[in-house]
A protein has these predicted regions:
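Short amphipathic alpha-helices and their capping/turn segments at secondary-structure boundaries
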Residues: 1-8, 58-68, 97-103, 153-158, ...
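N-terminal binding-site loop/beta-alpha segment at the start of enzyme catalytic domains
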Residues: 1-74, 136, 218
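Structural preference for beta-strand elements that scaffold enzyme active sites
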Residues: 5, 12-16, 43-44, 73-79, ...
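Active-site mouth loops of central-metabolism enzymes
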Residues: 18-28, 80-92, 116, 121
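Short, acidic/polar
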Residues: 25-38, 89-105, 151-155
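Residues at alpha-helix caps and immediate loop-helix transition turns in enzyme cores, especially N-
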Residues: 29-30, 56-59, 90, 123-127, ...
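Active-site groove signature of glycoside hydrolases
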Residues: 102-123
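Beta/alpha (TIM)-barrel catalytic core signal, keyed to glycine-rich beta->alpha loops juxtaposed to Asp/Glu
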Residues: 118, 122-293
Length: 293
């Protein structure tokens, strides 16, 4: 397993477990998922306050409460800013959200807080103030964003003193807008249209980790591409029983940059069958990047 070093004693696995679907699991199923991940060297668990209406965090928190010492083995991340159909970066909402997250997870701190979706009416200085407050109180260690482009991050950073450590973005073999424009520079192809202001390049230039969510998904919440009839060539190469060449998923030209050189990329994987998917991605991670969902 490869890890990102955020500080001298803080390492984040380059495969992460997305916890959205934990809301549909029993406590025992969630425990199996978590312990299987930890046994594979995965210490990164990604939550959001809206996952299952908070139930995902509650189930996870019950597990932490029942197993003293388990929390110390983890890097736990959660996200906030979505509520009642709005994206809300107000200080009041962020404070309230973090307190709710901590209560549901039954912990006194989270390692990372991401702002889930960009608030067009954000007040950067207000966000900066609440970030400092949360850091001083020990409730949050690191801060980042999710689904933001370059200029949104620059705007936010104008009022935030702390470095944004991560941007969580959708990316998979079947969803590649993040890198299409870079590959199709100076062409007439639709893929050459710059839709995100060069967000990937901006993150790399500024040491911001890219967390890719739903790396097995097609389109926007279109289900996974594994076993899907729309991708016969790809699926003909994938064996779930024995992976002889884990790099096969990154052989396509559009994803060649994901080979093991890029240590500041993180992938987040949603897992319903933990033993199969974690075993497969553990093998694949030797030549690729982090998974987070």
């Amino acid at each position: 397993m490869r890890y990102l070093e955020l500080d001298e004693n803080v390492k984040v696995s380059q495969i992460g477990i997305g916890c959205m679907r934990i809301s549909g699991m029993t406590g025992k199923e969630a425990e199996t998922l978590v312990r299987t991940a930890l046994d594979a060297g995965i210490n990164f668990f990604d939550h959001a306050d809206i996952y299952g209406g908070g139930k995902s965090e509650e189930i996870f928190g019950n597990l932490l409460a029942s197993a003293p010492g388990l929390r110390d083995q983890m890097f736990i991340q959660s996200k906030c800013a979505i509520h009642d159909g709005l994206y809300d970066f107000s200080g009041e909402h962020i404070r309230k959200s973090v307190d709710g997250i901590l209560a549901r997870l039954k912990t006194d701190h989270i390692d990372s807080l991401l702002l889930h979706r960009p608030d067009p009416l954000m007040e950067p200085e207000e966000v900066g103030e609440v970030f400092e407050e949360l850091a001083r109180s020990g409730k949050v260690r690191y801060f980042g964003v999710s689904n933001m482009n370059r200029y949104q991050m620059e705007l936010l950073s104008s009022g935030v003193k702390r470095k944004l450590w991560a941007d969580q973005l959708q990316m998979s073999l079947a969803h590649t807008p993040l890198i299409d424009a870079g590959i199709n520079v100076n062409t007439r192809f639709d893929g050459g249209l710059m839709r995100d202001a060069g967000t990937l390049e901006f993150c790399r230039l500024n040491g911001i980790a890219v967390q890719t969510w739903s790396p097995l998904q097609k389109g926007f919440f279109g289900g996974v591409f594994l076993g899907d009839d729309e991708y016969p060539e790809l699926n003909s190469e994938v064996s779930f029983s024995e992976i002889e060449s884990p790099s096969l998923l990154v052989r396509r030209g559009s994803l060649s940059l994901l080979r093991g050189r890029k240590r500041n990329l993180v992938r987040i994987q949603q897992a319903r069958n933990p033993s199969r998917r974690i075993r497969w991605w553990r093998s694949a991670s030797q030549g690729t990047v982090i998974l987070v969902s």
